[in-house]
A protein has these predicted regions:
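A hydrophobic, helix-centered structural microdomain
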Residues: 1-65, 155-180
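Acidic, Ser/Thr-rich low-complexity segments on the non-lumenal side of membrane proteins
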Residues: 56-92
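A short linear-motif detector with a strong N-terminal bias
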Residues: 26-28, 39-41, 71-72, 101-106
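Residue-level signal for short amphipathic helical patches enriched in basic/charged
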Residues: 27-30, 74-78, 94, 145
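Hydrophobic structural segments characteristic of membrane proteins
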Residues: 46-50, 55, 81-180
């Protein structure tokens, strides 16, 4: 019973944090969103599977992978519209990687990731930009599922900053999920 109460508390704490941070970031980043909207047109909707394998549409800008557009992609600014998904409760800041509807249905390993909200940042994303060996996306998502909690999320979020700034396969980050 105590475990259920703690898990529920973690869920509500995480959801509240997600909502407040997404709201604050949207208030600060609206000029960037407006500029991206003017340059790249309207947001695209990508069908994904979310918590409990419920379908949802992830918002993002379609950005070419050439020229100056690489900077937008490298800084992941094209994913800023996903803040609206976080506000709606479709996504979280930290969680397993969002899964495309098609491949997820075929790959039974992804059934494991359906009990958590997909995240803007995930363990797989950090590991793919660092020197950490890992078995793959599904294994990273399953590992996150087993260790999910506020402490784990803070550890992943802290590792996301150097992975974003320096992540080209040469970033040194600790091989533990939890840094606190």
């Amino acid at each position: 019973l105590a475990h259920r109460v703690a898990a529920r508390w973690d869920t509500w704490l995480k959801r509240g944090f997600d909502f407040l941070l997404a709201t604050a970031l949207l208030l600060v980043m609206w000029p960037v969103l407006l500029l991206l909207r003017l340059v790249y047109g309207p947001m695209r909707r990508y069908p994904q599977l979310g918590r409990w394998c419920e379908p949802f549409e992830e918002f993002a800008f379609a950005v070419p992978e050439s020229g100056l557009h690489r900077v937008v992609r490298a800084l992941r600014l094209h994913r800023l519209p996903a803040l609206f998904n976080i506000l709606r409760g479709d996504m979280s800041f930290v969680g397993p990687r969002p899964v495309n509807v098609g491949p997820a249905v075929r790959d039974r390993l992804y059934r494991r990731t359906c009990s958590a909200r997909p995240g803007l940042v995930c363990l797989h994303w950090i590991r793919s930009r660092s020197n950490i060996d890992f078995e793959g996306e599904a294994a990273s998502d399953a590992e996150y599922e087993l260790a999910a909690g506020v402490r784990t999320d803070v550890g992943i979020a802290l590792r996301a900053v150097p992975a974003l700034l320096y992540g080209s396969g040469d970033t040194e980050v600790p091989d533990t999920v939890s840094l606190l």
